[in-house]
């Protein structure tokens, strides 16, 4: 009798269906892991658009008026005929007092906290360059602030048109700080001009030699605000 009852219990267990646990069971009973939210994608830095202020446009327009000129005259006075002299003359013609060498202009921009390295500068900004020529004639690339130019226009793709006084007189230059080491793009559009003879194999393009920009046209805004 007892044997019969035992067989009945065993047969009942064999026919009984087990409880199903949905999902994977590998971690059932293991230590719980705290929920970690998915990492947020890093927000891409969007550089401010190039500004075209009234003062900046006046500086660029003044520089444009010097193109091709063999001498620079502002208000009846002959101006210094070199790169920084042309820059200062453009500012003077735009009624913004400015004077000094490339180094002095750079120091003024730093002192006024208007020096920047944005890839899209503002119209009227001064572009500063290093190592455009071997000023100390030691054969090394250690010549700082050897050239300056005026930003005339800035395109959406970052292509910058500059006006400068170089070996060929007062002419335009092209530069693209988004692609500083490329002379042209895939379509043949010029991105950077050659600004130095590359006998030593070093950088020669405008974008490679550019140190940054100074928005010294803002001097006029500060002068008006102080009145």
What is the role of each PLM region?
Residues 1-7:
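Sec-dependent signal peptide recognition
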Residues 7-15:
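Hydrophobic h-region of N-terminal signal peptides that target proteins for export
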Residues 14-34, 140-227:
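Aromatic- and glycine-rich peptidoglycan recognition patches
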Residues 14-99, 110, 204-227:
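N-terminal capping segments
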Residues 97-175:
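...with weaker cross-activation on analogous glycine-rich loops/strands in unrelated enzymes
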């Amino acid at each position: 009798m007892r044997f019969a009852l035992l067989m009945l219990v065993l047969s009942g267990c064999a026919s009984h269906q087990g409880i199903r646990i949905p999902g994977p069971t590998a971690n059932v009973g293991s230590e719980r892991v705290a929920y970690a939210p998915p990492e947020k994608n890093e927000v891409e830095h969007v550089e401010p658009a190039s500004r075209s202020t009234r003062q900046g446009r006046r500086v660029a327009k003044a520089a444009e008026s010097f193109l091709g000129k063999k001498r620079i005259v502002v208000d009846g006075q002959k101006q210094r005929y070199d790169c920084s002299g042309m820059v200062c003359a453009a500012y003077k013609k735009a009624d913004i007092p400015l004077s000094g060498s490339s180094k002095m202009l750079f120091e003024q921009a730093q002192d006024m906290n208007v020096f920047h390295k944005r890839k899209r500068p503002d119209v009227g900004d001064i572009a500063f360059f290093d190592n455009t020529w071997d000023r100390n004639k030691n054969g090394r690339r250690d010549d700082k602030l050897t050239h300056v130019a005026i930003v005339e226009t800035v395109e959406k793709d970052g292509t910058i048109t500059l006006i400068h006084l170089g070996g060929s007189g007062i002419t335009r230059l092209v530069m693209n700080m988004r692609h500083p080491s490329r002379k042209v793009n895939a379509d043949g559009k010029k991105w950077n001009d050659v600004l130095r003879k590359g006998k030593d194999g070093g950088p020669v393009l405008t974008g490679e030699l550019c140190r940054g920009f100074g928005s010294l046209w803002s001097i006029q805004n500060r002068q008006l605000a102080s009145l």
